Amino acid sequence: MQTYDSGIPTILIWLFAISQILYLGCFLLEMYFRSLKVNSVDMEDPLPATEAELPFIVLLYPVLRELERTMETTFTSLAKLDYPRSRYRVVAIPNANDTETIASLQRLTQTYPFVEILEVPATTDPRWDVVWNAWDANPKAYWWHNGKRAGSKDLPPKKTRQLIYALYQVAQTHRDKTHLTIDYIDADSCPPADHFKAAAIGLQKYDVLQARNVAGNLNASLAAAFHAFDHMTWDGAKYGHLSDPKQPFWVLGKGLFFKVDDLIALGGFHPWITIEDPEVGERFWKNGKTLGIIDSSLIEEVPETFDEGVTQRKRWVAGFFQSLGAPLKEMDFTFGERVRAWMNFLPCMSLWVNTLGIPLGVWAAWRFFTGDNALPLWLVVLSVFNIIAFTVLMVGLYMRTWTRTGLVLERTTDRIGYMLMVNPIFVMIWWCAWIVPLTLGFVMYLKDSGQVWQRTEKIDANNTLVRSKLDQFGVLRHDH
């Protein structure tokens, strides 16, 4: 093997150089995102002048084999919503064959009578005809007209199918309603009291609204700390920049608002993608719709074990790959638009670079400090620049994370404890471990799997937190 004078194998130097060039690319991508403006809903803006002009909001609650106590915690938060009762509905949408969840919901409606239940039947049921007829007439529902599943009514029995059925039922039931809007959340999502008010303000300016999320059980385990940190990094920091009209946007899958007329006109939800979030956002962006960010955060729970975290993340990764392939062509994205759409995924996908860069960085540092460094000068300069850039970015991220921990942790000692769990060394190891869900998700994409709802188990992890926060504040403090 060819070596430099110091005896360092040339292949290691080249690998180190590649890793540093990739790190520079990641930094430049980060700078691009930071150059994009964040379009936030200004809660100081006025509401519509009269109650009749407020959006009529139908909150959809898709559930599958959920714990009754998890749903009860969510309903506790929904009971605190500060919005005229005549201007919203809360509709749980279990599958019709999920008898255990339906029984739990029926018991809970005795305590929370504002909750309605809409059972989602099998797609052979004639009540689905409203969907098929709408898709027949709408070329925006390209999956129905083109591809290997064109015309297939055998939709996979997961969250997206529930949302599709409920969307068209809501549109049919409330044809006479002005400003008809849907919002949907996950089984464990607990919105703040001003969630609907934020929508009423924001929908006067934006077409789609997305609330931020914060994990409440971030101190439950080391795995939970890392999973919550992923949300701190993406949901709490980078995501808001996707609201710049220049950048194709995704949605986060809960705590978001669509105008029903827009969603119907654009074909509803794509049933054949593992997660619906990226594709529907891309479709809205391509059709000129704008995104606004609601800074008041939903409380959610994150997986408390690494196994559950991998299951969740591989599903995300598969959906990202799926949404960035054929759908972009079907939606007539130009090459430049496709590149920008891929940029949304690159911060996640680039985590694999750490599995190469971190060990090589340790090796290069060791050689340097032992006085046996033969790296080219340009590579030394690039490495120093990357270290400085990385340090600056991490300081900013940790400052942001410290601020957001205050949304759910009252005691300073708890906040410090969390920051210690997500210290830079542990985070580096975690980012290396991301190679596992990235690989598994890519395999899912290649196999066209992910059609079955691979659930992330919800364990009512935020029971006490949600009740104390809602009782104390009625609404979470905003994080700007």
What are these language model-derived features?
Residues 119, 127-173, 193-273, 310, ...:
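Long helical/loop segments within the catalytic core of UDP-sugar-dependent glycosyltransferases
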Residues 1-76:
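N-proximal low-complexity "stem/linker" segments adjacent to membrane-targeting elements
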Residues 94-108, 121-129:
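A conserved acidic beta->alpha catalytic loop
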Residues 175-190:
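Short beta-strand-to-loop acidic/aromatic patch adjacent to the donor-nucleotide binding site
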Residues 282-299:
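Catalytic donor-sugar/metal-binding loop of nucleotide-sugar-dependent glycosyltransferases
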Residues 29-54, 329-339, 370-480:
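Juxtamembrane C-terminal module of membrane proteins
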Residues 56-58, 89, 279:
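Cell-envelope/extracellular polymer assembly enzymes that use nucleotide-activated donors
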Residues 74-87, 111:
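Short, acidic, metal-binding catalytic loop of nucleotide-sugar glycosyltransferases
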